[in-house]
Amino acid sequence: MHAWLFALLAAAFVLYTDDYVIAGILPELANDLGVTEGEAGQLVTVFSVTVALAAPVAAVALARAPRRHLFAVALLVFVAANAAAASTPSFAVLMVLRIVAAFAAASTTPAIFAFAARHAPAEKVGRYIAVVALGVTGSIAAGVPVGTWVGSAFGWRATFTAMAVAGALVLLAVFVTLPRQNGPDETPVLREQLRILGRRPILLGLLANCVLMTGSMMMLTYLAPYLAAATTAGVEERALTFSLSGIAGIVGIWLGGIATDKWGADRTLLFGIGAIVATMIALWALWAARPAPLPVVLAVATVWGGMAFWNSPAIQARLHLLAGPVSGQALALNTSGTYLGVSIGAALGGLALSGHGVGALPLTAAGFALGALVLLAFARQADTATHQMR
């Protein structure tokens, strides 16, 4: 595999860590800037919302920009925003700087995946996407904990300084390793871009990803209350569950990439989503038989953690294949759908927890996974019909 692929992995790791890392330094940041922790938490919200809204717009507006230049400029803006965040005394200014950093991430993240897929050998598209996606799971498993440790040891401003330094190193790696282009990417006119993106197989696939993420994040967001209700697990055991799920996610995303190349996206998704449904039903059964044996719950949660990330390479490889010359724009919309699913999942999970208790969470999540499977079946049917018409 090429050196530039690992530079893009590092870029994904840094960009996603920057989104989530604030969660670990909220108390210190809020106290220093004179705001409540709830207000400080909006720094995470505004970053995620900005990425979700800006990613498709940036993908269309910057479609013809040489990728090497796009990544370099965006990462430079990212570095500057984090360096400034490390020294600002104002919460309002920090909020603006988070929006600036989010714009940089929005213009870069989908393009990174599209670049990896476009420059991968045909038989290794899934694996190339999986390598970059390891940066996403790695940010959750390692980036956020390390950023939190830096903040607790040296102050919250040191976390932003560390992000700026990491961004600068990634900028250097990308600029050195990424191949030069002879000219701008050939991109269809806007009307043709919208026509391609509006095809039913693509729209249904995008919706399926959003629905699948809604169910997955519903369970992940409220996994701690589930463990507390279904088992006798304490804080340490709950932390172990999250750690095992995170490690399984790293393994799952790599195996999902290999499966995509060997089985194809559709079979990979059928297996992955089917496994999610099975683990959700198992978690419900364990809750119904509470107190459930902790080792069994740990095993099921670990399998679920792996399967939750298994599907990502297949979803993106499928969109890349269907969207062709506008795969970057399709993956940007997929990024928006992912963030939307995260938000909806947390909200609906809270409603399910309040209205029906912990036991409703795994069954509701299983329902969303089945819904995603149905949407993907319709998407495949629509794609088959389109090819027959040709």
Please annotate each region the language model reported.
Residues 91-93, 121-179, 226:
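Helix-loop-helix hairpin linking two adjacent transmembrane segments in secondary transporters
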Residues 32-34, 66, 87-93, 232, ...:
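Helix-breaking motifs and short loop linkers at transmembrane-helix boundaries and internal kinks
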Residues 53-89:
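Conserved MFS/SLC helix-loop-helix module at the cytosolic interface between two early adjacent transmembrane helices
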Residues 97-136:
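Cytoplasmic helix-loop-helix junction between adjacent transmembrane helices
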Residues 54-67, 252-265, 353:
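Helix-to-loop junctions at the C-terminal end of transmembrane segments
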Residues 77, 81-84, 92-101, 295-303:
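Paired small-residue
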Residues 68-71, 94, 269:
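Primarily marks hydrophobic transmembrane alpha-helices of the MFS/SLC 12-helix fold
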Residues 267-314:
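C-terminal transmembrane helical hairpin of 12-TM major facilitator-type secondary transporters
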